[in-house]
Amino acid sequence: MGDARDNEAYEEELLDYEEEDEKVPDSGNKVNGEAVKKGYVGIHSSGFRDFLLKPELLRAIVDSGFEHPSEVQHECIPQAILGMDVICQAKSGMGKTAVFVLSTLQQIEPSPGQVSALVLCHTRELAYQICNEFVRFSTYLPDTKVSVFYGGVNIKIHKDLLKNECPHIVVGTPGRVLALAREKDLSLKNVRHFILDECDKMLESLDMRRDVQEIFKMTPHDKQVMMFSATLSKEIRPVCKKFMQDPMEIYVDDEAKLTLHGLVQHYIKLSEMEKNRKLNDLLDALDFNQVVIFVKSVSRAAELNKLLVECNFPSICIHSGMSQEERLTRYKSFKEGHKRILVATDLVGRGIDIERVNIVINYDMPDSADTYLHRVGRAGRFGTKGLAITFVASASDSEVLNQVQERFEVDIKELPEQIDTSTYMPS
């Protein structure tokens, strides 16, 4: 099987796109007149039923515990299910994935042996997660099959899957999808829905953009194209639109302000030598469901995790130095709640949804305001409360913190001696 859940026959990990330096120019506030810009609205009076979705989808939505669409779902789904091209920027945790999952499942008419929808994303973890969302929402659509394809898995497994039980929806990373398409194992001639998640990450990397373009040219001219991301600079938006025909543009709470709903943000000034002791104190003092601790390198992730385990903290780490099989096993272990602390590099900084995470600690300062946005967006997702704490240990750290505050017009205060649990812990 090519599905990530089968965890078999993994090869050595291939080149990782996700650890590339991220250089995203500042976004301006102004977008063209077609764009939709609104502030955060927690609960809309209208429900998912108002979108006239299939009963099978509504049933799966109820099973998942969703009662009301988020703002981005409210803005996007009615147009997306009509087949319109969509480009959407909305901050982390606002339910962008469900927009294209539900819209695709609503429209798809599965035909045996034909791939109708293609979803591309830049990391294997994100591909695995998106595939699971399709599986979750297609519970009552048994004829619709979805599979995930990415590097690090023996390509023969993927070829056999496509030959024996071709899925209707393919989720994957550009490199592996292109390899399968070039060798004629994966036919894209019937694709009706072409989706890029975290599109800026793929289109800013020239290598990945070339792969995406080549894949795009293998699909029919007449298809729906949807692109989503938490960060879309003014410079990358025209690149996105080259793939589209008169897209509907939705910029929910455009990036001028970082107002992640319910997220409390603080910093701590300290020396490099004081970080371990302070982290230990925080983990003892704070109430948390699960916490993600971000560091700047593979070696620091491994060392810090070892230290935490020695101090009897329920910690696990994920970084790009591991085999894909090991990374996936650890990700599943954390997501399922077997461990409460995750030490990670920026590999986990984009797109990974774990609902129980309510605290993010930047043990090492991120390298840019964009990276900060993606990291702290791991806490307080789905409109729940959360806390982000950033260690500031140098002049360059202070500079990045100032950039974050200026760019997102947010006032990040020093962590007080006492912090009210109710401000960051879901009730």
Curated annotation (Swiss-Prot):
Could you tell me where this protein is found in the cell?
A: Nucleus
* Cysteines engaged in disulfide bonds, as pairs: none
Motif DEAD box at which residues? Answer: 197-200
Q: Which InterPro entries match?
A: DEAD/DEAH_box_helicase_dom, Helicase_ATP-bd, Helicase_C-like, P-loop_NTPase, RNA_helicase_DEAD_Q_motif
> Where does this chain carry the motif Q motif?
46-74
A single Gene Ontology MF term assigned here is: ATP hydrolysis activity
- PROSITE patterns membership: HELICASE_ATP_BIND_1 (PS51192), HELICASE_CTER (PS51194), Q_MOTIF (PS51195)
Q: Which UniProt keywords apply?
A: ATP-binding, Helicase, Hydrolase, mRNA processing, mRNA splicing, mRNA transport, Nucleotide-binding, Nucleus, RNA-binding, Transport
Residues reported in the UniProt entry to bind ATP: 90-97
Stated EC number for the protein is: 3.6.4.13
Q: Where in this chain does the record put each Helicase C-terminal domain?
A: 278-423
List the transmembrane segments. Answer: none
Entry GO terms, CC: cytosol; nucleolus; nucleus; plasmodesma
**Region of interest (Disordered), residue spans:** 1-30
Predominant place of localization: nucleus
Enumerate composition-biased segments (Acidic residues): 9-23
Q: Which reaction does it catalyse?
A: ATP + H2O = ADP + phosphate + H(+)
Q: Tell me which residues make up the Helicase ATP-binding domain.
A: 77-250
Which family, according to the similarity comment? Belongs to the DEAD box helicase family. DECD subfamily.
Q: What is known of its domains?
A: The Q motif is unique to and characteristic of the DEAD box family of RNA helicases and controls ATP binding and hydrolysis.
Record's function text: ATP-dependent RNA helicase involved in pre-mRNA splicing. Required for the export of mRNA out of the nucleus. In addition to ssRNA and dsRNA, binds dsDNA, but not ssDNA.
Subunit and interaction comment = Interacts with ALY2 and MOS11.
Task: List the protein's name.
Answer: DEAD-box ATP-dependent RNA helicase 15
Natural source organism: Arabidopsis thaliana (Mouse-ear cress)
| Taxonomic lineage | Eukaryota, Viridiplantae, Streptophyta, Embryophyta, Tracheophyta
